[in-house]
Amino acid sequence: MSRKPLIAGNWKMNLNHFEAIALVQKIAFALPDKYYDKVDVTVLPPFTDLRSVQTLVDGDKLRLSYGAQDLSQHDSGAYTGDISGAFLAKLGCTFVVVGHSERRTYHNEDDALVAAKAAAALKHELTPIICIGEHLEVREAGNHVIHCEEQLRGSLAGLSAEQIGKVVIAYEPVWAIGTGRVASASDAQEVCAAIRKELASLASAQIADSVRVLYGGSVNAKNVGELIAQDDIDGGLVGGASLDGEQFATLAAIAAGGPLP
């Protein structure tokens, strides 16, 4: 099955709503509409930017989509500081990241919570980008594939085969995030292939073949081509490079198969 590449820009805790508008405008200007037939492009701003991004995307009829970096497992109630999937859906979000390593590390989120958040996203017709990945000591011990398979199972626990078919998986080796280090294309392919095999056992081979598996970890315009050329890598969850409109547009154009804009 042919899977359309997805390039997702995770802005993390960067850019106020004025800066968000400027960046989306720059991406839209740098990446002509013709590329969107071959690649899906989404930006993932902070919560406080979403309304401004929605207004711009809708008003200018831009073809890129947008989403959020997290959501609550709850729909509403006395959960101070939380943001529900219902709120994100009302803002027109398409995607939402769950289980990013920074959430797992700094907020002690475990696989059970990630699975609950993924279910909450699907309930509100949002596509969860479910993140998994190993720390350096796990890779150096040679346990990276087993670790990621276990994390995947835990993060999908309770989801039906049909629901699994609606998610995106992002493999993000923790040691490569924001460090400038990047897994080699063959290293990334090894884990992404194992992820797809595990998806087949959890759902079906047909569903596994339809799910997009992204690589995240210092993705940029220089390495995305080699990464996305791998059989089981369908795009990138992009961090720092997504804050540069021209580089992000170039990265998306490469994922679309070129030529450069």
UniProtKB/Swiss-Prot annotation:
MF terms in GO: triose-phosphate isomerase activity
UniProt pathway: Carbohydrate biosynthesis; gluconeogenesis; Carbohydrate degradation; glycolysis; D-glyceraldehyde 3-phosphate from glycerone phosphate: step 1/1
Cross-referenced InterPro entries: Aldolase_TIM, TIM_sf, TrioseP_Isoase_bac/euk, Triosephosphate_isomerase, Triosephosphate_isomerase_AS
The keyword Cytoplasm belongs to this UniProt entry's keyword annotation: yes
Record GO biological process: gluconeogenesis; glyceraldehyde-3-phosphate biosynthetic process; glycerol catabolic process; glycolytic process
Classification via PROSITE patterns: TIM_1, TIM_2
Principal location: cytoplasm
CDD domains: TIM
Active site per database record: H100 (electrophile), E172 (proton acceptor)
GO CC term (a single one): cytosol
Compartment(s) where it occurs, according to its Swiss-Prot or TrEMBL record: Cytoplasm
EC number: 5.3.1.1
Catalysed transformations (reactions): D-glyceraldehyde 3-phosphate = dihydroxyacetone phosphate
Binding sites annotated in the UniProt record for substrate: N10, W11, K12, G178, S218, G239, G240
Protein keywords: Cytoplasm, Gluconeogenesis, Glycolysis, Isomerase
HAMAP family assigned: TIM_B
Similarity comment: family membership: Belongs to the triosephosphate isomerase family.
Subunit-level organization: Homodimer.
Purpose of the protein: Involved in the gluconeogenesis. Catalyzes stereospecifically the conversion of dihydroxyacetone phosphate (DHAP) to D-glyceraldehyde-3-phosphate (G3P).
Protein name, as recorded: Triosephosphate isomerase
Classification of source organism: Bacteria, Bacillati, Actinomycetota, Actinomycetes, Mycobacteriales
